[in-house]
Amino acid sequence: CYDWFEMNTLNMAQQGVFGEVIRAQGAYIHNLSPFWNHYWKNGENDKLGWRLDYNMRHRGDVYATHGLGPVAQALDIHRGDRMKTLVAMDTKSAIGKALVEERADSTCNNFRNGDHTTTLIRTENGKVIEIQHNVMTPQPYNRLYQLTGTKGFANKYPISGYALDAKQLTASGVQPKIDDLNSHSFLPKSEMETLVAKYQHPILKKYGEMAKEVGGHGGMDFIMDCRLVYC
């Protein structure tokens, strides 16, 4: 919720830049292979560590907050809309099962968490949310974060960008400098910077530079605390 892109995009969504947001994506996709050995272990006989053990015992999206939080804000969940229907599907556990067998030196017959889980949620007002979870396969870190609106589009990974329809470009204060600027591609860098400057989130205006100095996930942890102070 507290990444610069997500916060500025939230402000744009709340100001109507994207029109009505009808679909959103979020995820926690983070290959944890370098980290499994560093999670807390319950004594020297614990071969797995708490996180791998938790994934082994629980099915579904076991860490939905990273993906769901930002898009729930953008869709006004519990601020005029609510989640109504959910369906989820996961792959089999191939890597997770192998990790347990490698560490425990025994056969793993029931690793419950699939290597990749996809969840679809439909809201009361007819919006759709897609959330993904994957901590197993070798791929770049990705929270997806994508908003699809009736007048515009925002995307964080793998390339950050915004696209707006022709009328919304002018309405949002963007003055195109090239003739073919349209919703078929992301805004050029200069126009994107203009848009972000206009709709910079108030919390970032007040605490952004301080957050960069303090750090903590690039300043996001600090911004999260600042939101409590700001409220």
Identify the meaning behind each predicted range.
Residues 128-130, 153:
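Short, mixed charged/polar active-site loops
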Residues 32-34, 137-140:
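Short glycine/serine/proline-enriched coil/turn segments at secondary-structure junctions
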Residues 54-61, 106-108, 133-134, 208-218:
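Active-site rim elements
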Residues 2-111, 228:
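Predominantly a Rossmann-like dinucleotide-binding segment in NAD(P)-dependent oxidoreductases
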Residues 72, 140-158, 163-231:
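C-terminal helical cap and adjacent loop that interface with cofactors, partners, or active-site loops
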Residues 82, 115-117, 143, 150:
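Residues that flank catalytic or metal-binding motifs in active/ligand-binding sites
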Residues 119-125, 149:
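Active-site beta-strand termini and strand-to-loop segments that position acidic
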Residues 65-66, 110-115, 123-124, 138-139:
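A short catalytic or substrate-binding loop motif that flags glycine-/basic-rich loops and adjacent residues
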